[in-house]
Amino acid sequence: RVEEIFEQATKLNLKTQIIKHGESINKGMEIVLINSFGVLNYYYDYCKSIFIGKSLEKKLISVSGQNPLEAARAGCKIYHGPYVYNFHEIYEFLSKINITKKINNTDELAARLIQDFRTVKNINAKNIKKINIYGENILKKTTKEIIKLI
């Protein structure tokens, strides 16, 4: 899938790079595709906007969406499709504080990203504090449920 996205972005004359674990982002890139597991946190500091995968394709509804909290903590604007089953409550919370935005198709995503290219990254310390508290509460609830099972 990464190669297909790379080809489409290149056809649109967007400066695009595929990154594997440990590689640096080349200067002037407009789209960066990270093709490695467990390294996203390293790159979030360099991103204004991100798109969460597995959220636009209905066929992936049973495994839809990825956890957006780390990107939110880094101050990224987060776009996602309608299928965020795995993290529905988190997306609702982040939407209320204007960090996530649901998009319905790739054209809408493209329009949002083009708009974002013209802005600077805005890190809202109050929102990040809210996100951290929210994450801590999730951890506490999860820990309580695990203790019940032990």
What role is predicted for each listed range?
Residues 1-150:
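Nucleotide-activated sugar donor-binding and catalytic core shared by glycosyltransferases
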